[in-house]
Amino acid sequence: MSTINQLVRNPRKKKVIKSGVPALDSCPQKRGVCTRVYTTTPKKPNSALRKVARVRLTNANEVTTYIGGEGHNLQEHSVILIRGGRVKDLPGVRYHTVRGALDTTGVDSRMQGRSKYGTKKPKK
Protein backbone atom coordinates (compact mmCIF):
# COMPACT_ATOMS: atom_id res chain seq x y z
CA MET A 1 0.00 0.00 0.00
CA SER A 2 1.31 3.46 -0.89
CA THR A 3 1.73 6.21 1.68
CA ILE A 4 -0.01 9.58 1.29
CA ASN A 5 3.32 11.23 0.47
CA GLN A 6 4.04 8.72 -2.28
CA LEU A 7 0.59 9.34 -3.79
CA VAL A 8 1.07 13.13 -3.64
CA ARG A 9 4.38 12.80 -5.47
CA ASN A 10 3.13 10.29 -8.03
CA PRO A 11 -0.68 9.86 -8.25
CA ARG A 12 -2.40 6.69 -9.39
CA LYS A 13 -2.69 6.30 -13.15
CA LYS A 14 -6.10 5.87 -14.81
CA LYS A 15 -6.48 2.78 -16.99
CA VAL A 16 -6.67 3.77 -20.66
CA ILE A 17 -9.47 1.90 -22.44
CA LYS A 18 -8.62 1.34 -26.11
CA SER A 19 -11.51 1.49 -28.58
CA GLY A 20 -12.11 -1.53 -30.80
CA VAL A 21 -13.45 0.74 -33.57
CA PRO A 22 -11.23 3.86 -33.65
CA ALA A 23 -12.25 5.02 -37.15
CA LEU A 24 -15.86 5.62 -36.06
CA ASP A 25 -14.88 8.56 -33.80
CA SER A 26 -17.42 7.52 -31.11
CA CYS A 27 -20.26 7.51 -33.68
CA PRO A 28 -22.64 4.55 -34.09
CA GLN A 29 -22.18 4.47 -37.89
CA LYS A 30 -20.16 6.27 -40.55
CA ARG A 31 -20.64 6.81 -44.28
CA GLY A 32 -17.92 6.01 -46.78
CA VAL A 33 -17.07 5.31 -50.41
CA CYS A 34 -15.80 1.91 -51.55
CA THR A 35 -12.33 2.11 -53.02
CA ARG A 36 -11.99 -1.63 -53.63
CA VAL A 37 -14.38 -4.61 -53.37
CA TYR A 38 -12.76 -8.05 -53.23
CA THR A 39 -12.77 -11.49 -51.57
CA THR A 40 -10.26 -12.81 -49.09
CA THR A 41 -9.63 -16.08 -47.28
CA PRO A 42 -10.06 -16.51 -43.51
CA LYS A 43 -7.32 -17.77 -41.22
CA LYS A 44 -7.01 -21.39 -40.11
CA PRO A 45 -8.97 -23.61 -39.53
CA ASN A 46 -11.72 -21.93 -41.61
CA SER A 47 -11.97 -21.94 -45.37
CA ALA A 48 -14.12 -19.67 -47.56
CA LEU A 49 -14.07 -16.60 -49.80
CA ARG A 50 -15.19 -13.76 -47.55
CA LYS A 51 -16.53 -10.62 -49.24
CA VAL A 52 -14.85 -7.44 -48.01
CA ALA A 53 -14.51 -3.84 -49.15
CA ARG A 54 -11.90 -1.17 -48.61
CA VAL A 55 -13.73 2.04 -47.67
CA ARG A 56 -12.67 5.70 -47.47
CA LEU A 57 -14.77 7.26 -44.68
CA THR A 58 -16.06 10.83 -44.38
CA ASN A 59 -13.39 11.49 -41.75
CA ALA A 60 -10.69 10.50 -44.30
CA ASN A 61 -9.90 7.17 -42.62
CA GLU A 62 -9.50 4.10 -44.82
CA VAL A 63 -10.83 0.85 -43.32
CA THR A 64 -11.65 -2.70 -44.37
CA THR A 65 -15.28 -3.69 -43.86
CA TYR A 66 -17.05 -7.05 -44.10
CA ILE A 67 -20.08 -7.49 -46.37
CA GLY A 68 -22.43 -9.96 -44.67
CA GLY A 69 -25.23 -12.03 -46.23
CA GLU A 70 -25.58 -13.92 -49.50
CA GLY A 71 -24.71 -11.81 -52.55
CA HIS A 72 -24.22 -8.04 -52.76
CA ASN A 73 -24.34 -5.20 -55.29
CA LEU A 74 -21.31 -3.22 -54.14
CA GLN A 75 -18.63 -2.01 -56.51
CA GLU A 76 -16.03 0.73 -56.56
CA HIS A 77 -17.50 4.20 -55.78
CA SER A 78 -20.57 2.73 -54.01
CA VAL A 79 -21.59 4.84 -50.99
CA ILE A 80 -22.10 2.63 -47.93
CA LEU A 81 -22.80 2.87 -44.21
CA ILE A 82 -20.50 1.00 -41.84
CA ARG A 83 -20.91 -0.06 -38.22
CA GLY A 84 -18.54 -1.56 -35.69
CA GLY A 85 -18.12 -5.29 -35.18
CA ARG A 86 -15.07 -7.33 -36.06
CA VAL A 87 -14.85 -10.58 -38.01
CA LYS A 88 -12.92 -13.05 -35.90
CA ASP A 89 -11.38 -15.07 -38.73
CA LEU A 90 -10.37 -12.09 -40.92
CA PRO A 91 -7.36 -10.23 -39.48
CA GLY A 92 -7.69 -6.45 -39.77
CA VAL A 93 -11.45 -6.42 -40.47
CA ARG A 94 -13.09 -4.50 -37.59
CA TYR A 95 -16.20 -3.14 -39.30
CA HIS A 96 -19.40 -4.41 -40.96
CA THR A 97 -21.39 -2.86 -43.80
CA VAL A 98 -25.01 -2.03 -42.96
CA ARG A 99 -27.20 -3.88 -45.48
CA GLY A 100 -30.21 -2.00 -46.89
CA ALA A 101 -28.73 1.47 -46.23
CA LEU A 102 -27.52 3.96 -48.89
CA ASP A 103 -26.22 2.09 -51.99
CA THR A 104 -26.22 -1.34 -50.33
CA THR A 105 -29.25 -3.51 -51.10
CA GLY A 106 -30.75 -5.89 -48.56
CA VAL A 107 -30.43 -9.65 -48.87
CA ASP A 108 -33.18 -11.10 -51.11
CA SER A 109 -35.13 -14.19 -50.03
CA ARG A 110 -34.17 -13.71 -46.38
CA MET A 111 -36.94 -14.81 -43.99
CA GLN A 112 -35.34 -14.89 -40.55
CA GLY A 113 -33.09 -12.25 -39.00
CA ARG A 114 -34.28 -9.85 -41.71
CA SER A 115 -33.52 -6.67 -39.75
CA LYS A 116 -29.81 -7.50 -39.73
CA TYR A 117 -29.75 -7.81 -43.52
CA GLY A 118 -32.02 -4.93 -44.59
CA THR A 119 -34.80 -7.13 -45.96
CA LYS A 120 -38.41 -5.94 -46.11
CA LYS A 121 -41.22 -8.09 -44.71
CA PRO A 122 -42.56 -10.35 -47.48
CA LYS A 123 -46.13 -9.81 -48.72
CA LYS A 124 -48.67 -12.47 -47.73
UniProtKB/Swiss-Prot annotation:
InterPro entries: NA-bd_OB-fold, Ribosomal_uS12, Ribosomal_uS12_bac. The lineage of its organism: Bacteria, Pseudomonadati, Pseudomonadota, Gammaproteobacteria, Candidatus Pseudothioglobaceae. Transmembrane segments: none annotated. It comes from Vesicomyosocius okutanii subsp. Calyptogena okutanii (strain HA). PROSITE patterns: RIBOSOMAL_S12. GO terms for cellular component: small ribosomal subunit. With S4 and S5 plays an important role in translational accuracy. Interacts with and stabilizes bases of the 16S rRNA that are involved in tRNA selection in the A site and with the mRNA backbone. Located at the interface of the 30S and 50S subunits, it traverses the body of the 30S subunit contacting proteins on the other side and probably holding the rRNA structure together. The combined cluster of proteins S8, S12 and S17 appears to hold together the shoulder and platform of the 30S subunit. Belongs to the universal ribosomal protein uS12 family. Disulfide bonds: none annotated. One of its GO terms (biological process) is translation. Part of the 30S ribosomal subunit. Contacts proteins S8 and S17. May interact with IF1 in the 30S initiation complex. The gene is rpsL. GO terms for molecular function: rRNA binding; structural constituent of ribosome; tRNA binding. The modification 3-methylthioaspartic acid is found at D89. CDD domains: Ribosomal_S12 (cd03368). Pfam families: Ribosom_S12_S23. Keywords: Methylation, Ribonucleoprotein, Ribosomal protein, RNA-binding, rRNA-binding, tRNA-binding. This is Small ribosomal subunit protein uS12. Residues 105-124 are annotated as: Disordered.
